[in-house]
Amino acid sequence: MFTGIVEEVGTIKSINRGQHSAVLTVCAKTVLEGTRIGDSIAVNGICLTVRQLFPDSFAADVMHETLNRSALAQLTVGSAVNLERAMPANGRFGGHIVAGHVDGVGRIANIRKDDTAIWYTIHSDPAILRYVVEKGSITIDGISLTVAAVEPTGFSVSTIPHTVRQTNLNQRHKGDFVNLETDVVGKYIERLLPSETPKQNTLTKEMLLRCGF
């Protein structure tokens, strides 16, 4: 599990693409501390397993499903990526519950400044937007953010300068694709609720008597 608090911005060192998968090598520093092969690191919000460790980088496999569902396929050598190690049991819960399993992608429709705040408007599919609520949490490229406004075709978040400086948001432009993970709590609640309103029971004592019971 992750929290959406980015520890550092890494750089894509290499991408070895196969027919249905890829191997990413990411230059990093902070997230390498204490990391072992088999540990999890979120790369732009996607939980990846470390397969190799180097003095200045790590390598991870990316499966076909992840490539299809995320914006990782848009990465090139030199791309800046947000990195976060899995939260330890005694770690500080600074953001919100982030599984590292992205729901899909969004596209930056607009970026504007409002005094010190920087607003990002993201357009996405209705299947994702149904879980986006005003003042709720959402993960954009691994960053835990609060939804400031919801529209029929997307939503907006308002970020502080510190967040922009400490993440790859300062390198994002209008038209860029980003990974989105909605709040997992909402998805679990939907799954547990009945799929439809139970039908009213029309069986009565009079009906039973008419039928000979």
How would you label these PLM feature ranges?
Residues M1-F213:
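Conserved loop->alpha-helix
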